[in-house]
């Protein structure tokens, strides 16, 4: 409750409306042993000229565990397979969990991190009214994560506090769909069209939901200019 009150007072910066380039709401769980609850975290990414690829700020300051570090290397593998087939990767991008002071472990935010990075490099805004959870492999396939019900309810509460718009909701891996057990209040909000749950099988699906644009299919070594990946290659 105190954490959500801090969001309401703007001490923790989370928005459930608008679109921003290089910023995604990742769904997380805070576990205090006898009590766990969901609270979204803002993942931000900033890109610039260079050839260093992804720079994980948490890793650089020893605030990330081995699973989180592995997830960032997985993201790098995916990015290089998409954008460095014919020439070396030609960007650098810092990615971090904003207002994180206790360390990060796990790979459940890797889809959110990848979306923030792609958004920063392409300068295509990401919807803030959608929270994201899900692990991914180097092929971009969405993988199931733990605590999905807590995560959904955590973002639902943020949306309820800030006001429903009808287009808010969460993205989760399809493999997690059978694990979702929600409070009746959340179930009713979904039935009434106030809140949504989208399931995805691939990171491309998440990118398209968050941007409203095609992610892009490569033809003859090029992505369409009007796609997210095409803009990332510009």
Segments and roles (model prediction):
Residues 3-16, 20-25, 39-234:
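Peripheral, non-AAA+ core regions of ATP-driven protein-machinery
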Residues 22-34:
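Structured beta-strand/loop patches that form or line metal/cofactor-binding pockets in enzymes
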